[in-house]
């Protein structure tokens, strides 16, 4: 999941990396 590779996005949307 692309968001998971972007720290800021991962922090803002941890559910996308879950």
Swiss-Prot record:
Disulfide bonds join 3-9, 4-17. Keywords: Acetylcholine receptor inhibiting toxin, Amidation, Disulfide bond, Ion channel impairing toxin, Neurotoxin, Postsynaptic neurotoxin, Secreted, Toxin. It is found in: Secreted. GO terms for cellular component: extracellular region; host cell postsynaptic membrane. The keyword Secreted applies. The modification Cysteine amide is found at residue 17. It comes from the Eukaryota. Belongs to the conotoxin A superfamily. It comes from Conus bandanus. The keyword tRNA-binding does not apply. This is Alpha-conotoxin-like Bn1.2. Residues 5-7 are annotated as: Lacks the Ser-Xaa-Pro motif that is crucial for potent interaction with nAChR.
